[in-house]
């Protein structure tokens, strides 16, 4: 019969052995990501988890402006991947971020896209706005979506912002803007070039990049929020976005890359 002392030793040995075989509990990481990342965020998360197996990023997609408002008002997102640099900078100024500066991770591009075989996006903004076959013209919300601001700036640059008003269909974010074209609710849309690299949309219809002459770049920045200050994976994920692995994923999905991003 085992004595109490021997039984205690056995229990301690069993517990010690299992401590080396049980997997570490995954630590959640709440990420707010701009909608233009929707087609590659799963690939980015999977690649990050290879470097940090105990991380479990939970991603919400939406308009950068909406996430800005939510984080400013205390939403518990730990990382914010914005489609611009301005919203992260504002959160830093408001004291709602742990980062001291946004980390640039991608440069977005906008493209004209149509599924109508009779409509050629290569004709350009002015011609498409004037085309009577184009009854609805989709852009993202210029107030809350950086890609919407870029679309408005391009239309203003080409002198057709006022003319397009009667045809405008405004998406809450850039993903919804693409859906308007995809479902036939708009004959033409200004969408993110990255979205056209997705498995779902690649090869659908015709598209043409919108010239960036005279337009500011759509530089996209990431920050660790105040809520993420105590989670090492928040800073780890932001650093990962500057790694060769992440940059290759972003480039493959139609994004430009900022110079000087560090691993």
Locations of regions flagged by a protein language model:
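Exported/periplasmic ABC-transporter solute-binding proteins
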Residues: 26-52, 56-61, 65, 69-73, ...
